[in-house]
Swiss-Prot record:
The lineage of its organism: Bacteria, Bacillati, Bacillota, Bacilli, Bacillales. Under oxidizing conditions two disulfide bonds are formed involving the reactive cysteines. Under reducing conditions zinc is bound to the reactive cysteines and the protein is inactive. The gene is hslO. GO terms for biological process: protein refolding. This is 33 kDa chaperonin. The keyword Zinc applies. Coiled coil: none annotated. It is found in: Cytoplasm.
Length: 294
């Protein structure tokens, strides 16, 4: 099944809800970055949470999330847009612990760390950026997105994200949900939401069992008939890097730096952090970039 995201309204229009299956997307991220179990879970959760923030944006806007904890994984970066395109990377892809956490799951909190910051940069187009930042409160990532939305954007939300990793480090299931209360929600509605959230199985297990974004939202809303589906968005790992972009980056280094690349290295190789694609620049190509540099 191809990955996709569903946007809907629930609870008589008093809650905005999103759910996504991201299994194939996170499989692609794992393949590109050769991530081990805990790094895979942390990267997959971050990418899925970022996907939801991207889905809240207008057509030409982009969102970048950076989670910088004090754990061995190091900074995690993901970006997404309103079209369901997502990419991400983790500083240390090779984190695996032989022990599970007290809940019998991969110890993502230990990998990410419990001290640090979650930063969100919204590229609003026209060269305008909005930046929000909140401390890491959990290291489990879903709770950290929830705290960010409540604190920085003043939206009471619940974010659940999960990745099921096989013993051979391949990805079995990935996805998540996000629920946001809208103004006017009554105490009765809030009680019902809390009851349904408590009864919800873990996201990765639901997806492993074959649940779809629609069926996850039906569980969250207390029935299919209580959902008003607004939009279905295909989701995929997409990177917009190119040799031209890296060429521009090399030009920005200045003539001295480019000259040393030519004379000492006789060329250059650039690698994209997000997708691991590499771009080779010959001496001749560097000479052309040298002429364009200041």
């Amino acid at each position: 099944m191809s990955d996709y995201l569903i946007k809907a309204l629930a609870y008589d229009g008093m809650a905005r809800v999103y759910a996504a299956v991201t299994t194939e997307t996170i499989k692609e991220a794992q393949r590109r970055h050769d991530t081990w179990s805990v790094s895979s879970a942390a990267l997959g959760r971050t990418m899925t949470g970022t996907l939801f923030l991207g889905a809240m944006q207008k057509e030409d806007q982009k969102i970048t999330v950076k989670i910088e904890g004090d754990g061995p994984i190091g900074p995690i970066v993901a970006d997404s847009n309103a079209q369901g395109q997502i990419r991400g990377f983790v500083t240390n892809p090779h984190v695996h612990f032989s022990e599970l956490n007290e809940a019998g799951k991969l110890d993502v909190r230990r990998g990410v760390g419990t001290s640090g910051m979650l930063s969100v940069v919204k590229d609003l187009g026209f060269g305008e950026n909005f930046t929000g930042q909140t401390p890491i409160v959990s290291g489990e990532i879903g709770e950290d997105f929830t705290y960010y939305l409540a604190t920085s954007e003043q939206v009471n939300s619940s974010v659940g994200v999960g990745v099921l990793v096989n013993p051979d480090d391949t990805i079995e299931a990935a996805g998540g949900f996000m629920l946001q209360l809208l103004p006017g929600a009554t105490d009765e509605i809030i009680d019902e939401i809390e009851k349904n959230l408590t009864a919800l199985p873990t996201v990765s297990r639901m997806i492993e069992a074959g649940e779809t974004p629609e069926s996850i939202l039906a569980k969250l809303a207390g029935g299919e008939d209580k959902l008003q589906i607004l939009e279905k968005i295909p989701v995929s790992f997409e990177c917009n890097c190119s040799k031209e972009r890296f060429g521009s980056a090399i030009i920005s280094l200045g003539k001295d730096e480019i000259r040393s690349m030519i004379e000492e290295d006789h060329g250059a190789e650039a690698e994209c952090h997000f997708c691991r694609n590499t771009y080779d620049f010959s001496e001749e190509e560097l000479e052309k970039l040298y002429e364009e540099a200041k």
